[in-house]
């Protein structure tokens, strides 16, 4: 016999992605490839893409949760760029992180200067006093 065949030897274990090993949804392999191809450093460690993918996943989940809340507040079931804008600009830390970022079709935060608001009339209070 040639020594080749199904009998003998261990069966190869099912391949497991680095994302599933790390318990992530974001692609660790793709992040690793992009780090290598991007000329950020001569060498890229094995833990770096896992950490970066985890950070990206966390930030994405945080923004999507706040945007989902904004959509629900507006009685909508689909997140649109306006909801992303409201979520980011109303959160102090995310607004600082993404301060220079422009979101297409995001609009602006509703804001009216206090001096432009109508003044409360005092005649109502004087009438009660008499």
UniProtKB/Swiss-Prot annotation:
Residues where N6-(2-hydroxyisobutyryl)lysine is found: 6, 10, 37, 75-76, 96, 119
Glycyl lysine isopeptide (Lys-Gly) (interchain with G-Cter in ubiquitin) crosslink location in chain: 14, 16, 120
Positions bearing N6-lactoyllysine: 10
Sequence positions bearing N6-crotonyllysine: 37, 119-120, 126
Database matches in InterPro entries: Histone-fold (IPR009072), Histone_H2A (IPR002119), Histone_H2A/H2B/H3 (IPR007125), Histone_H2A_C (IPR032454), Histone_H2A_CS (IPR032458)
Modified positions (N5-methylglutamine) in chain numbering: 105
Annotated positions of the N6-(beta-hydroxybutyryl)lysine modification: 37
Subunit and partners: The nucleosome is a histone octamer containing two molecules each of H2A, H2B, H3 and H4 assembled in one H3-H4 heterotetramer and two H2A-H2B heterodimers. The octamer wraps approximately 147 bp of DNA. Interacts with VRK1; the interaction is mediated by the nucleosome acidic patch, a cluster of negatively charged residues of H2A and H2B forming a cleft within the nucleosome core.
Protein name, as recorded: Histone H2A type 1
Native source species: Rattus norvegicus (Rat)
Taxonomy of the source species: Eukaryota, Metazoa, Chordata, Craniata, Vertebrata
């Amino acid at each position: 016999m040639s020594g080749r065949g199904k009998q003998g030897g261990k069966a190869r274990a099912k391949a497991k992605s680095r994302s599933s090993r790390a318990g992530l949804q974001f692609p660790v392999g793709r992040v690793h490839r992009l780090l290598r191809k991007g000329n950020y450093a001569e060498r890229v460690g094995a833990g770096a893409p896992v950490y970066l993918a985890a950070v990206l996943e966390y930030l994405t989940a945080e923004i999507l949760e706040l945007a989902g809340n904004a959509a629900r507040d507006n009685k909508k079931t689909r997140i649109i760029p306006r909801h992303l804008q409201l979520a980011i600009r109303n959160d102090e830390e995310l607004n600082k992180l993404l301060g220079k970022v422009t979101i297409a079709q995001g609009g602006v935060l509703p804001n009216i200067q206090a001096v432009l608001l109508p003044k409360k009339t005092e005649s109502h209070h004087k009438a009660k006093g008499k």
